[in-house]
Curated annotation (Swiss-Prot):
Binding site for substrate: R35, D36, S189, H218, Y309
PROSITE patterns: PYR_CT
Cited NCBIfam families: 4OH_2_O_val_ald, PRK08195.1
Top-rank taxon: Bacteria
Name listed for the protein in its UniProt record: 4-hydroxy-2-oxovalerate aldolase 1
Domain Pyruvate carboxyltransferase: 27-279
Originating species: Parafrankia sp. (strain EAN1pec)
Length: 377
């Protein structure tokens, strides 16, 4: 028998009798509490709160921390909601607080500009997601290219992914890849995807994307599937995972970070996060900030059921209060019309149409939804 000297390697035994080594995912966990979570507090985080959350997340081992107005860089506006601070103040708070996690931000072409991207980079942002509606990847080319020129990690973020069939979504992902994206996400902005829907979209991605291009999942919990959909995504090739403390995010929130990490531990996946630290920050810091519970309830469940952009929730609730409607009726009509992110201003139009449609019996309802509200005249 020939002996092997130290340092000499051999090819792995691939004989049929030897079971294959199980694949263990090594996840890139990105926290979105300080960006998507802005929606849950009407974009009102204080700078000190941002600093506290970022410090705790960094200590708990997440790979990246996303920070911006809920609608991305330059999102602060009457249409989307005025932020308590500028993006730059929040970003400076985060970049000054982290030593290991990658400071990240989000940019929606048409809201944020290349100038905004450059300013974010100057303040320490090193990764960016360029977000478009799921059928409009072509408008991301300039911003993805600019991010690459700055030496940033850049991902494409295809929002409302339930509105495009798997093959079409994959075609859009291929466009983002061609512009230079290192990663492309399935972004379930409406919390509408089921586990089968998630599986089919990631399989479609794998059919067309270069193996070197990463894929990621951004789930919302409107149907109660945030963790389950994220698990299915990882099982079908996703390496980047979005989640937030206590699920803090638009609608019923995002995939709850601490719950997902617990599941990932049970499944033996690598993630680098410290579970108890995440639990403590979720319960002691984040939950007390909520002026409206982030949970699956009749309004947020309607978001997922009707396939409505999750950040429409607070806008629809305000319109319902103003015009004496059931929030669910507004959301169901918004879903029927296929409204997408950026059309927040049209929610009032929907409410006025529903008021005009009200019958003489004092019942305000969307004929399509079958949901009624009592007469509040």
């Amino acid at each position: 028998m020939t002996s092997l000297s130290a340092g000499t390697s051999t090819a792995p035994d691939t004989s049929p009798d030897r079971p294959a080594e199980p694949f263990v995912p090594d996840l890139y966990v990105q926290d979105v509490t300080l960006r998507d979570g802005m929606h849950a507090v009407r974009h009102r985080y204080s700078v000190e709160t941002a600093r506290t959350i970022a410090t705790a997340l960094d200590a708990s081992g997440v790979r990246a921390i996303e920070v911006a107005h809920g609608d991305g860089l330059a999102g602060s506006s009457i249409n989307y909601g005025i932020g308590a601070h500028t993006d730059w103040e929040w970003i400076e708070a985060v970049t000054a607080s982290v030593t290991n996690a990658i400071p990240t931000s989000l940019l929606l072409p048409g809201i944020g500009t290349v100038r905004d991207l450059r300013q974010a980079h100057a303040l320490g942002i090193r990764s960016v997601r360029v977000a478009t509606h799921c059928t409009e990847a072509d408008i991301s080319a300039q911003h993805i290219s600019a991010a690459r020129d700055l030496g940033m990690d850049v991902a494409g973020f295809l929002m409302m992914s339930h509105m495009a069939a798997p093959a079409e979504l994959a075609r859009q992902a291929r466009l983002m890849e061609s512009y230079g994206a290192h990663c492309v996400y399935v972004t379930d902005s409406g919390g509408r995807l089921t586990m089968d829907d998630v599986r089919d979209r990631f399989r479609a991605y794998s059919d067309v994307l270069d193996p070197a291009t990463e894929t990621g999942i951004h789930a919302h919990h409107n149907l109660g599937l945030g963790v389950a959909n994220t698990v299915v995504a990882v099982e079908n090739g996703a390496t980047r995972v979005d989640a937030s403390l206590a699920g803090q995010g638009a609608g019923a929130g995002n995939c709850p970070l601490e719950a997902f990490i617990a599941v990932a531990d049970l499944m033996g996946w690598k993630h680098g996060c410290e579970l108890f630290g995440l639990m403590d920050t979720a319960d002691d810091v984040v939950r007390p900030l909520q002026d409206r519970p982030v949970r699956v309830d009749r309004e947020t469940l309607t978001l997922g059921y009707a396939g409505v952009y999750s950040s429409f929730l607070r806008h629809a609730e305000a319109a319902a209060t103003r015009y004496g409607l059931d929030t669910r009726t507004i959301l169901a009509e918004v879903g029927r019309r296929g409204m997408v992110g950026g059309q927040e201003d049209m929610i009032v139009d929907v409410a006025l149409d529903l008021v005009a449609r009200a019958t003489g019996r004092g019942i305000v309802a969307s004929a399509e939804s079958g949901i009624t509200a009592p007469d509040q005249s």
